[in-house]
């Protein structure tokens, strides 16, 4: 079987409509290059100074930038602008406002001031706030994020912004993400500068590359399923005769209509200046992946949000529907969003790059030790920040990392860190090359890839695989940055007194690594994380196994994690409580919605399908006695009765849930009762579907869906 993957690397040699893509790359993005060209140089320098040194822009500078941005936007067909932000819901929001205004003489004029660029005022009353805001407290503010590029989609200029309440409470995910990067940078450079005397680091950037998985289904088939239309997941559906058993979809031939879809997506991404690196078929039928090149973490999150919007929009243009739910179809793999995490200094040093001699690479050893400690110490926080209720259907299903947080270093690095722990001499592998067929020898990677680990070292970065495909990467990276900062701060306190004595510093480096391994190496696993043996071993080691998102939230409630956010001002106690309540509300809303959809489908689709089958069988049985047909009739009849009972029970559970006021108790009730009942109901419905003839199945089956792209 041919293995195909479209890789663009940095050279865009695809022809679309006769134009070489590199000529159009970034034409819809008001990036640093365009700003430098459009602004008077002194104004550009003021913007750059404000960006680098976190200063406020004066009104004159803001007005000049706004004027240049407006002229550029108008020349590219924009008629409106919007402050674009990411509220606590995790879904981007905006309000379109027109450039056109009216002069004192009543004549039309295009206006856009520095004040309108820097600050906006959307209604904040209807966004999730976890109780921080009352409905009548409507005022909220958006503030321009100078670090991100503005861009044009359609006829709208989008300006990335931070969203806050009237009282200054954080109502979004961008602000805390930027703040968490700053505190990590502040602690990280102090450690780097202890060892790199010749190159002074004044800043560190968190660089993230996100790999987005998704499903594509035919639009007409999608429209015939209420569950797909409402929640993006099939809540009933028997397995297809052929699923992913043959592994013929993974990296296989991309269907022609999907190739056209990819082509359209690429064109939009390139115009926005987003580097689409790779695209390919994933494991499950109808499942695909796109990867975007590494960017500063806040820009990477923006790029991913834009990618998701473009994938959905472009799919519809191609008579397809793009699904981001982590588990839209049972019995085949679900989708994730792999978060590749690295930290780089202002002069390009990647602290997770082991180099040729990792044992003597002090910076590498310390930063990896910090990540080991952070991963183990904040397991529950990482589990929550990488997940959602919808991700529960994927985690731990022998297709994605289990719900247990573990770390894979690879055999070479694990041996290095264990040798330091045991205080034995580390012997580097002599032959670190690989010879391919008819090729020169090439360096061998320092680690294999463990797809079963929640966190895996992959050469010069750590890949966090738990992140759900529908979720923004903001929460996970905020948690990572803060947890890393916490560890790095303690490490620096140990090292700082000996900053002028490298011999003592070196001894302390090994001592710190040993201490971290003594306390936290339980989180390291080099085997099969899917296996029952690992689950039993993880339990013996005391690792958390939160099987559901709600279970992880419960554990988080009992674990004092807030200090890593509070002491550096990332969140206030009020904001942490609010975020926690928003997460609990998500549990309630998700399962309640699924329950309502299940009741509707039972009444309108599933039970009628069973009754239609009985109607067809009844005259045959009246005419001829057939023991097998009679048994089939009885099975379907009993299943219909059971499904009707399930429907009544779900209705009663929903009614009881609606009377619970406390959000924690409500989430617990919904998780323990409604979610459990929905799983049991599905089992009956799926078993009944297997007994129904094709002509009586009114819902598109898995077989129909999986063959809809060819």
Regions found by a protein language model. Name each.
Residues 1-9, 14:
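N-terminal amphipathic/hydrophobic targeting modules at extreme N-termini
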Residues 25-136:
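Active-site core of metal-dependent hydrolases
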Residues 16-19, 131, 138-140:
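Gram-negative host-targeted secretion-system effectors, predominantly Type III and Type IV
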Residues 61-65, 85-87, 115-116, 163, ...:
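Active-site-proximal loop/turn and secondary-structure-junction residues that shape catalytic pockets
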Residues 78, 82-86, 301-317, 343, ...:
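Hydrophobic/aromatic-rich, well-ordered segments within soluble, folded domains that form packed cores
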Residues 516-710:
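C-terminal amphipathic alpha-helical interaction region
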Residues 90-106, 125, 225, 232-234, ...:
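Short linear, low-complexity motifs centered on an aromatic residue
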Residues 137-324, 333-336, 343-583:
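Glycine-rich, acidic/polar active-site loops that bind/position phosphate-bearing ligands
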């Amino acid at each position: 079987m041919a293995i195909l993957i479209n890789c663009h690397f940095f050279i865009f040699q695809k022809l679309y409509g006769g134009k070489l893509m590199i000529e159009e790359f970034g034409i819809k993005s008001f990036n640093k290059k365009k700003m430098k060209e459009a602004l008077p140089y002194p104004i550009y320098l003021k913007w750059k100074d404000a960006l680098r040194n976190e200063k406020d822009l004066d009104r004159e500078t803001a007005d000049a930038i706004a004027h240049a941005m407006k002229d550029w936007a108008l020349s590219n067909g924009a008629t409106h602008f919007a402050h674009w932000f990411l509220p606590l819901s995790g879904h981007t929001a905006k309000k379109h406002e027109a450039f056109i205004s009216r002069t004192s003489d009543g004549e039309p004029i295009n206006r856009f001031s520095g004040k309108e660029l820097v600050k906006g005022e959307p209604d904040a009353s209807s966004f999730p706030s976890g109780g921080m805001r009352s409905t009548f407290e409507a005022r909220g503010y958006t503030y321009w994020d100078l670090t991100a590029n503005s861009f044009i989609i359609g006829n709208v200029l989008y300006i990335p912004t931070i969203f806050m309440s009237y009282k200054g409470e954080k109502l979004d995910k961008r602000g805390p993400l930027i703040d968490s990067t700053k505190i990590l940078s502040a602690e990280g450079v102090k450690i780097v500068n202890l060892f790199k005397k010749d190159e002074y680091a004044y800043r560190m950037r968190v660089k993230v590359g996100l790999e987005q998985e998704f499903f594509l289904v035919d639009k007409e088939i999608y429209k015939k399923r209420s569950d797909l239309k409402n929640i993006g997941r099939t809540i009933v559906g028997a397995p297809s005769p052929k699923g992913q058993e043959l592994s013929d979809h993974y990296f296989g031939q991309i269907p022609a209509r999907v190739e056209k879809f990819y082509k359209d997506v690429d064109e939009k991404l390139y115009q926005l200046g987003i580097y689409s690196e790779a695209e390919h078929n994933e494991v499950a039928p109808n499942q695909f992946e796109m990867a975007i090149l590494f960017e500063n973490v806040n820009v990477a999150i923006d790029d991913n949000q834009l990618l998701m919007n473009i994938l959905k929009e472009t799919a519809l243009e191609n008579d397809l529907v793009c699904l981001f739910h982590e588990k839209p179809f049972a019995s085949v793999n679900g989708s994730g969003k792999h978060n590749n995490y690295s930290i780089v200094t202002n002069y390009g040093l990647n602290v997770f790059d082991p180099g040729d001699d990792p044992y003597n690479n002090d910076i590498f050893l310390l930063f990896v030790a910090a990540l080991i400690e952070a991963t183990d110490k904040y397991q529950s926080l990482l589990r929550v920040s990488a997940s959602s209720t919808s991700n529960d259907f994927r985690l731990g299903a022998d297709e994605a990392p289990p719900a247990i947080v573990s770390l894979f270093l690879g055999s070479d690095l694990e041996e290095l860190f264990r040798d330091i722990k045991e205080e034995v001499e580390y012997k580097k592998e002599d032959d670190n090359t690989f010879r391919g067929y008819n090729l020169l020898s090439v360096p061998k990677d320092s680690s294999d890839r463990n797809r079963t680990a929640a966190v895996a070292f992959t050469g010069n970065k750590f890949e966090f695989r738990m992140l759900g495909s529908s979720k923004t990467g903001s929460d996970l990276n905020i948690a990572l940055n803060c947890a890393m900062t916490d560890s790095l701060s303690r490490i620096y306190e140990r090292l700082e007194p000996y900053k002028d004595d490298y011999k003592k510093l070196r001894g302390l480096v090994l001592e710190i690594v040993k201490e971290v391994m003594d306390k936290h190496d339980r989180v390291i696993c080099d085997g099969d994380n899917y296996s029952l043996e690992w689950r039993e071993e993880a339990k013996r080691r005391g690792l958390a196994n939160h099987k559901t998102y709600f279970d992880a939230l419960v554990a988080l409630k009992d674990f004092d994690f807030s200090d890593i956010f509070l002491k550096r001002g990332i969140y206030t106690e009020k904001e942490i409580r609010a975020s926690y309540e928003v997460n609990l509300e998500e549990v309630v809303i998700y399962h309640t919605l699924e329950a309502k959809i299940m009741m509707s489908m039972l009444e309108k689709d599933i039970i009628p399908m069973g009754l239609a089958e009985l109607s067809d069988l009844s005259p045959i049985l009246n005419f001829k006695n057939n023991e097998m047909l009679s048994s089939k009739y009885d099975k379907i009849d009993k299943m219909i009765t059971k499904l009707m009972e399930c429907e009544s029970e779900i209705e009663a559970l929903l009614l009881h849930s609606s009377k619970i006021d406390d959000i924690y108790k409500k989430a617990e009730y919904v998780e323990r009762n409604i979610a459990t009942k929905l799983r049991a109901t599905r089992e009956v419905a799926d078993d009944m579907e297997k007994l129904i003839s094709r002509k009586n199945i009114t819902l598109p089956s898995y077989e129909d869906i999986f063959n809809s792209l060819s």
